[in-house]
């Protein structure tokens, strides 16, 4: 780990674990107001402190098929439910966000229809997900979930927090198209490459990841090969 720490210090001195969630948190905070009612779509057990917005809005609700959501400490209410059938009334939320959820959806169009339904007019949807043209999702699609669980355990992540992936709304084009089909208005899609987390276990792979990050970050026409996709859409005001 000594050489890896040295590479961390030299190339990514300002990075820390879950740097992508720090970026997403900042994006969410720019869209949350003090009196907002917010839905964390795919809230899970509450293992990511960056997704705690209790001090910045009125209430945060959460849904997830994982029953641990009911004990998520960041939520006013956590409900075991799927995104295809959100258990809340029409026009209920000011903001809906999904952190590392979109890649797991087998029917993203259905989920976005539900997002549209529960958002108030003018409400905002934000999603953070891997870009499917990056090498990590490409490898993921060629390997079974059992491999993902094993590799994530090597990285220090619990197997129960690794889920099957579909990558059906994981590029800029798909995000724009599926949002429009659900009557949501796409506002922006950011594509970002950062510290290569999945390659940091070994020096040789880490060096490759650093070179890749430098290239795709500096050449704009390679932006579609960056790892992180953050999409923002809005429910039109009637």
Predicted regions and their residues:
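Glycine-rich, phosphate-binding/catalytic loops in enzymes
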Residues: 54-58, 78, 113-118, 142-145
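A short SAM/SAH-binding and catalytic strip from SAM-dependent methyltransferases
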Residues: 95-106
